[in-house]
């Protein structure tokens, strides 16, 4: 339990509430604090480490300033929010909830259950909430969250440590010594004593301070530590106050008779050595804690000479250390670009680590010879949106878990020891693990999945665009249309022609660095980055006509940066809704194309992307029954497909599962959709908007 240089050098003391002017002129300042000496001088014993809910070996703190994580709002424990690491000291993190100000910063241990990696909330089916006191309109929260996470550095799951187990019994005894967090100044850890024990609670009293700072807590509280904890973790332990008489073993200066039996552990006029790592903050315990001040770093060894103490010197603010925090200039950089980029003082400009991505699963596609179709059906419809490393790991792990022969699929993964996500598999009686390459962009993750799917011979299994819930099969769409009417099935087979009024959703390029190139291609015909696709005529089977235009944006490795056009608007709706208009990506397909030979015309463009036309509600109803409240479940689903193809895929199954017909559609509210249907806030708000628009155009 050796003393660290940083801790010894930081002579940061608390102001003595009972200090008199006479004692301040001759008391001795102590530059360090040793538990062994203190226990011997006071005749006390320290509480055994088994009494605490703390790790026997303190956890390693490898977090960096600026990292993002999920944390529970300390003022609303039911909400999980996005937080940023603002400061680091010992095994603790100073956190700030994104969307709040610096008045509500809080501290957590690296093994606290209140913090978790970004993506955990989504994985468990929960929603990230705005913090209490969110400074903007709550309707802006989804967009704020997206901007905050995009390009930010996410704390790796390996940085989070498991919470230690709870001691079975309360074995604390009155008089035992320990280290405890001052709850009125939570950045301080001070020597304390067990003042009382009642059931599973203990009374914490701070040595040398009045009872104003004492508090009761559970015996398994994470705010109390065994003696010596700060030295082991590199945190700063504040020395006791002045009420405890201590026999000094160091040279004493002359003292007045009034203080012969009492020695102050702090005196501002004594010589103090401040090493280069010292940082300055407030530490008066007389005043209530205010906002955390910005720490300042000293660049040279300073020698503070004795000086006469004035009448108001008792109110002088003392320095308070915060290890591994940031300078004022760095803190300013933490908040630029709406908090999207951060700098670490130790490592310089931070690297943009990752963005977000969402990948959809085609459960009616070709699974190849290596994946079990039954297990594929049990997968979620999509992975994400979330950090690219998390989404990539979950998808690859799902493919390994769905393998007919785990060893074969696992063998397609090439080991990479650069610190990426870990994939595990069990075969040959052993558990094997392999690291994926580290990812820092959505395009890299999508290209990796393209190659992986190509190796598994299931090129159309994954897509960056949603699939149709019942018409994504590349071989026979009729097999998955048992719940559709015969008329709809026949109409779908005639949809190889696209009318000028047919809506084509905007397809996001696989790589965000690609030029804005809009091109048409068939499902099996990739478009290369150079723009040189091979125009050709394809003979499509009768069963594959509908699937060719309803396929998703497959992740095909045949090209470097492939793009595919995904459509989900049927020909019958285009004819029945004359008021529906859209702006196509480029050009139009030749009207002379036969149903069996479709020539795809391509043209490079750099103008603004196209938009999805949202039909007027009054026009939409003409394609169905007169009154939307009489719509069937299938008509509601068809309405959503035409209104917003981007969210219609996941909604189709939900609407069928919950039997959402026209009447139920009008009764849907955002909170109901989020709570009972599991929708995220963004899709729920979109759906509410469409419902309101539909109500406005409702027939009287």
UniProtKB/Swiss-Prot annotation:
It is found in: Nucleus. Coiled coil: none annotated. The keyword Flavoprotein does not apply. The modification Phosphoserine is found at residues 256, 261, 267, 299-300, 499, 511, 522, 570, 583, 590, 594. MBT repeats lie at residues 33-131, 139-240. One of its GO terms (cellular component) is PcG protein complex. Residues 1-33, 253-320, 466-550, 575-594 are annotated as: Disordered. Putative Polycomb group (PcG) protein. PcG proteins act by forming multiprotein complexes, which are required to maintain the transcriptionally repressive state of homeotic genes throughout development. Highly expressed in placenta, thymus and testis. Detected at lower levels in brain, liver, skeletal muscle, pancreas and ovary. The modification Phosphothreonine is found at residues 305, 503. CDD domains: MBT_SCML2_rpt2, SAM_Scm. Belongs to the SCM family. There is a cross-link at residues 518, 536, 599, 605 (Glycyl lysine isopeptide (Lys-Gly) (interchain with G-Cter in SUMO2)). This is Sex comb on midleg-like protein 2.
């Amino acid at each position: 339990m050796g003393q660290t240089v940083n801790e010894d050098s930081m002579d940061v003391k608390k102001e003595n509430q009972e200090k008199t002017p006479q004692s301040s002129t001759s008391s001795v300042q102590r530059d360090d604090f040793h538990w062994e000496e203190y226990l011997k001088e006071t005749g006390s014993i320290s509480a055994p480490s088994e009494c605490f809910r703390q790790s026997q070996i303190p956890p390693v703190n490898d977090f960096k300033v600026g990292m993002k994580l999920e944390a529970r709002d300390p003022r609303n424990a039911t909400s999980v929010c996005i937080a940023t690491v603002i400061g680091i000291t010992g095994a603790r993190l100073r956190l700030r909830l994104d969307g709040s100000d610096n008045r509500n910063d809080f501290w957590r241990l690296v093994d606290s259950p209140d913090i978790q990696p970004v993506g955990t909330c989504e994985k468990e089916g929960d929603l990230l909430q705005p913090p209490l006191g969110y400074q903007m309109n709550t309707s802006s929260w989804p967009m704020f969250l997206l901007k905050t996470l995009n390009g930010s550095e996410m704390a790796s799951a390996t940085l989070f440590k498991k919470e230690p187990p709870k001691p079975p019994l309360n074995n604390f005894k009155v008089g035992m010594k320990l280290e405890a967090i001052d709850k009125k100044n939570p950045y301080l850890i001070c020597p304390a004593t067990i003042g009382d024990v009642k059931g599973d609670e203990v009374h914490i009293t701070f040595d040398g301070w009045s009872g104003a700072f004492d508090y009761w807590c559970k015996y398994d509280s994470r705010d109390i530590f065994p003696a010596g904890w700060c030295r082991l973790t590199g945190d700063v332990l504040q020395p006791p106050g002045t009420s405890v008489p201590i026999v000094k073993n160091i040279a004493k200066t002359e003292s007045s008779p009034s203080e012969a039996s009492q020695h102050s552990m702090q005196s501002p006029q004594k010589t103090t050595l401040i090493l280069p790592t010292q940082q300055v903050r407030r530490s008066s315990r007389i005043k209530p804690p205010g906002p955390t001040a910005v720490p300042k770093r000293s660049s040279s060894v300073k020698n503070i000479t004795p000086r006469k103490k004035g009448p108001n010197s008792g109110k002088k603010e003392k320095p308070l250390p915060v290890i591994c925090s940031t300078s004022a200039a760095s803190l300013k950089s933490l908040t630029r670009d709406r908090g999207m980029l951060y700098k670490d003082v130790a490592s310089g400009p931070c690297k943009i680590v990752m963005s977000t991505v969402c990948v959809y699963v085609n459960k009616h596609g070709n699974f190849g010879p290596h994946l079990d179709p039954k297990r594929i059906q049990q997968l979620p419809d999509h992975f994400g949106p979330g950090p690219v490393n998390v989404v990539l790991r979950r998808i690859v792990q799902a493919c390994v878990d769905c393998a007919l022969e785990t060893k074969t699929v696992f063998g397609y993964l090439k080991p990479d020891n650069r610190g990426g996500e870990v994939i595990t598999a069990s075969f040959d009686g052993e558990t094997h693990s392999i690291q994926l390459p580290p990812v820092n962009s959505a395009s890299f993750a999508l290209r990796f999945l393209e190659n992986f799917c190509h190796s598994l011979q299931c090129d159309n299994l994954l897509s960056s665009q949603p699939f149709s819930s019942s018409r994504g099969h590349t071989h026979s769409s009729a097999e998955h249309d048992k719940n559709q009417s015969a008329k709809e099935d026949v109409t779908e087979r005639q949809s190889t022609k696209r009318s000028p009024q047919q809506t084509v959703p905007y397809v996001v390029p696989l790589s965000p660095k690609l030029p804005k190139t809009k091109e048409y291609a068939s499902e099996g015909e990739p478009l290369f980055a150079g723009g040189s696709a091979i125009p050709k005529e394809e003979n499509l089977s009768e069963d594959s006509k509908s699937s060719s235009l309803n396929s998703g944006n497959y992740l095909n490795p045949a090209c470097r940066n492939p793009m595919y056009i995904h459509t989900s608007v049927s020909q019958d709706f285009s004819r029945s809704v004359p008021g529906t208009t859209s702006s196509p990506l480029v050009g139009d397909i030749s009207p002379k194309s036969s149903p069996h030979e479709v020539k795809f015309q391509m043209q490079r463009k750099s103008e603004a992307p196209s938009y999805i036309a949202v039909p007027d509600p009054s026009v939409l109803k003409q394609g169905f029954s007169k009154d939307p409240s009489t719509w069937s479940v299938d008509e509601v689903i068809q309405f959503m497909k035409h209104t917003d193809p981007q969210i219609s895929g996941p909604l189709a199954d939900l609407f069928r599962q919950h039997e959402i017909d026209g009447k139920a559609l009008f009764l849907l509210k955002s909170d109901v959709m989020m709570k009972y249907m599991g929708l995220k806030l963004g899709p729920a708000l979109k759906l509410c908007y469409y419902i309101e628009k539909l109500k406005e155009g409702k027939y009287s």
